[in-house]
Amino acid sequence: MKRLSTPYQIMMVIAMGFAVFYPTLYAEICLVDDYDAISYFFSQDTFSLKEIFFPQSAGGGYYRPLIGLSYLLDKQLWFLHERLMHFESVVAHTLNVLLVFYVCREAVNLHLKRRETWLPLAAALLFALHPIATESVNWISGRTDIMMGTFVLVSVLCLLRFIQGRSKILLAFAILSALTACLAKEAAFGYLIGLPLFALYRVDTVSTVENQGYFAWLRLFLVYYLCAFFVALLFGSYWLVLGIALVYLAHISYNKFDIENISVSAGRIVKYSGVLISVFAVSAGLFILLRRLAFTSSVSKIGQTFTLMLADINYTISLFLGAVGFYVKKFFIPLPLNFFILEIDPLYDFVGIAVLLLFCHLILSKKLPAIFSLLGLLLLLPALPFAFGTIAWTAYAERYIYLSSAFWIIAVCLWGGDWLGRNPARKRLVTMMVVIVCLFASGITFKRNIVWQNNVTLMRDTVTQTPQIRKLRNIYIKALLDKGMTDEAVKHYQLAATSLPSLAGDEQAALMVSGKLIVKGSNNEALQLYQDALLSTHFKSEPLLIATIKLLQAMQSVGTVPEQERKRLEGLSNKYSSLLDEIDHNK
């Protein structure tokens, strides 16, 4: 690995990335969001940049104009062809992988002060093959994370080169790229919050762990963790958990700064921090202004979420800690992969507490690995309110740590470089471990990409892991019907209708399944399904009544129907017509 030149390393990364994501090129349009988005842009005869950046619509949700712009370009270039759009996603992910390679190379040169050509290659391969990337790459609507990642990684690359004393134009370009990332996805504001961390970077700093010794640090960490653990377990007070974390931060701060020789000018720190904090404040203000110009009002779900957050702050802290613990675990142990995650195990709260205490160490460190770790955590912040399940279609999602994983991988590689500097004899062992991890990751990722190729396999996997959600069943039923698997669709519809609660407007599944049965000539089966669905809706569904009446009239017109059966069908038709008239009268 050490002798492999940069061009060969890049070719290896690209080749492995495309080999693993090759199945993505033949994936269908996902029934969740992708189909609706593509249909919407297909239906628009004309579209202007003003409509994308300033639509002036009411009930605005996400403000991500760059995504709309990408769909517009797809329409102009290749008529929104799904294979080419999937190819775009794979290429964009590969671009991010190359950016991780160059960012890690700059970080290694800056942090280790020596050339370690294999560390950037390891970082790029781990990011390229990490199973957590599959959702963002395969789901066309998930391109938001990839686009945001490109601009954020370009910003980091420019900042690292600026820190090494290169042109100040790089700083301006880094800020501009970070602002552009916010137009792809709001999570980029987490990166903007962390920008001042680069101003605090110091090469000669000594970490708290190194000051105290590893065993002394671990002992202190465990004491505070156990205190927080039992407070959360026995009393459920997460306010006290935060208090313990603050005491822990004060404790290690005293130990750190009591012996540390601060060699960097405080004026320089204040100067650059002030500049970057001002940039964040201005960019946040500009984003809010753009959003208000784009939408006449915001979707009610956003307000509902903030109301829930403030209603019980102790619960909010618990929910956020659990989410952080869940995502950090997903980075190290991504399995099982799931497209729809509504809730997580409450035990992740305790993982989140450990991450919170580690955060205290990271925030005091001015080393580059700590900065990258913190940036990965900060990129998670905007996704935490989604855990309430009121904004997005799923409360938790693997794609939320797509970019965080890049920062954490770089941090792990930098720490690994530190450790190998003290233990050079272990380099061969570490190299073998990286190769093994990459092989396992590539196998998992390739297999997951095959699942994503087909709506039936994707939704079957999702329903298997989350069987209690009715809307997932309905999407699965549609996928089955689109593939002509009517019998299996009927089976799953009947299972959902009898075992899962009905949703408002849930008649769509009944209409889809019955429509396919009618095409097959199974009119009696379709009629029975309509009647069961009408009963579950208390005969209040207008679309179901209309469809049932049409079916009854068609069945009456068949010449071979016995007279007695014809009268029965006519009676049902009259009954449902009366119910429909009653609904129209009450409108």
Region spans (language model):
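Polytopic membrane enzymes that build or remodel cell-surface glycoconjugates and lipids
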Residues: 1-488, 494-512
